[in-house]
């Protein structure tokens, strides 16, 4: 069964400016600019109202899979709005039983060096995605803080760090060493 029209709107806050170029969405805010291309999805994007403070996503004559993309695009745009206003922050903790994991940040927070993992001499180097800054927490021991505007780049950088410390050829129920995401949040606190 095909639905004639499915649509959804996203409210745009005052301090955020959104422009559309075809199916490319550009979001400008206090923390910077994010752009995302939705050309591969066959939907209509339009800005509503005199002040253009609402974004509407329309899908005509879609089946179930195609209608799901409407909500997906809205969620992506909401994440972009949240990124340019509040920013995203992931906190990661080092977990070790015996050999303390030594983490060093190089090149202004764009390269993470992991040493002494399970007592190995090999140095693991993880390059952060562009626009993601990594730092060592001052308040908490063995904690890394990743910050950026794009939730996908921040979470992907966290995944790269976690995957760099996978335990090979051992029983992973016993060897739980690694660097894991402990907290996900925003850089600035939302004004409730």
Curated annotation (Swiss-Prot):
The modification N6-acetyllysine is found at residue 121. It is found in: Cytoplasm. One of its GO terms (cellular component) is cytosolic ribosome. Its main location: cytoplasm. GO terms for biological process: cellular response to nerve growth factor stimulus; cytoplasmic translation. GO terms for molecular function: rRNA binding; structural constituent of ribosome. Keywords: Acetylation, Cytoplasm, Ribonucleoprotein, Ribosomal protein. The keyword Secreted does not apply. Component of the large ribosomal subunit. The ribosome is a large ribonucleoprotein complex responsible for the synthesis of proteins in the cell. Belongs to the universal ribosomal protein uL6 family. Component of the large ribosomal subunit. This is Large ribosomal subunit protein uL6. The gene is Rpl9.
């Amino acid at each position: 069964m095909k639905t004639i029209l499915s649509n959804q709107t996203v409210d745009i806050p005052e301090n955020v400016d959104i422009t559309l170029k075809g199916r490319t969405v550009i979001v400008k805010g206090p923390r910077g600019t994010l752009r995302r291309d939705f050309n591969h999805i066959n939907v209509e994007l339009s800005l509503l109202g005199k002040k253009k403070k609402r974004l509407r996503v329309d899908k005509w004559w879609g089946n179930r899979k195609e209608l799901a993309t409407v909500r997906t695009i809205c969620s992506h745009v909401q994440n972009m709005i949240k990124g340019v206003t509040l920013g995203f922050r992931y906190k990661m903790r080092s977990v070790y039983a015996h050999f303390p994991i030594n983490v060093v940040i190089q090149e202004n927070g764009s390269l993470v060096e992991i040493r002494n993992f399970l007592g190995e001499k090999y140095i693991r180097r993880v390059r952060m995605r562009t626009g993601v800054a990594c730092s060592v927490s001052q308040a908490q021991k063995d904690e890394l803080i990743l910050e950026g505007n794009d939730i996908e780049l921040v979470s992907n950088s966290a995944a790269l760090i976690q995957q760099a410390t996978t335990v090979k050829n051992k029983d992973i129920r016993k060897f739980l060493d690694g660097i894991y995401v402990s907290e996900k949040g925003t850089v600035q606190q939302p004004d409730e």
